Amino acid sequence: MQYNLTRIDPDAPNEQYPIGKRETVSDPLEDQVHKNIYMGKLEDVLSGAVNWGRKNSLWPYNFGLSCCYVEMTTAFTAPHDIARFGAEVIRASPRQADFMVIAGTCFIKMAPIIQRLYEQMLEPKWVISMGSCANSGGMYDIYSVVQGVDKFLPVDVYVPGCPPRPEAFLQGLMLLQESIGKERRPLSWVVGDQGVYRAEMPSQKEQRREQRIQVTNLRSPDEV
């Protein structure tokens, strides 16, 4: 599996996303196993245990921009029960949150505020872009709307829809958990390679292309 490597360099504060250098590398744990099978396997087990704890205890930051935020909060109600994924603990401060959901239209005036909130989050942290407006500007192709939050934030999961249903948000959360389970991060700030390795996850659109092509009976737009 290929990984995207982002170097952690505390002496270069100006090299932030999207300016920071990134490169595509192979799984670093495989290289460790080839060098020393015992230490490599031990590091693999420790990394898996840490990732298991991270992905099953994701605390979201209570933040929303537009109508997609209403659908996001619906996922916290009893019929959907987001507590199954360990993500029911909504945090009022970005310093206590693990991931941020950009739900709604991102205006240019809000972009610096969103970036400031993201920078206040502690590592490790992740971003979910929810809805067409957050993904690409949606129907607002105008000067005052940012055409995709990935212009200034590193997005981990994109949830399409206008607005997406709560089930779509939950699927995006599960995809984020899957990605976190395959991440490679340093176990401390002084031990190991100081870099963040994020797995290159396959696109759900490409994976389901053949399945969508085979569909012949389209559902009526009057049916929900």
From Swiss-Prot:
EC number(s) in its UniProt entry? 7.1.1.-
* Residues reported in the UniProt entry to bind [4Fe-4S] cluster: 67-68, 133, 162
Topology relative to the membrane, per the entry? Answer: Peripheral membrane protein
One function term, GO molecular function aspect: NADH dehydrogenase (ubiquinone) activity
The record's similarity note reads:
Belongs to the complex I 20 kDa subunit family.
Reaction(s) the record says it catalyses: a quinone + NADH + 5 H(+)(in) = a quinol + NAD(+) + 4 H(+)(out)
Q: Does the keyword NAD apply?
A: yes
Stored SUPFAM superfamilies: HydA/Nqo6-like
Q: Tell me which UniProt keywords the record has, alphabetically.
A: 4Fe-4S, Cell inner membrane, Cell membrane, Iron, Iron-sulfur, Membrane, Metal-binding, NAD, Quinone, Translocase, Transport, Ubiquinone
**Pfam families reported for this sequence:** Oxidored_q6 (PF01058)
Q: Which cofactor does it need?
A: [4Fe-4S] cluster
A biological process (GO) of this protein is: electron transport coupled proton transport
Which EC class is the enzyme in? Answer: translocase
Q: What is this protein called?
A: NADH-quinone oxidoreductase subunit B
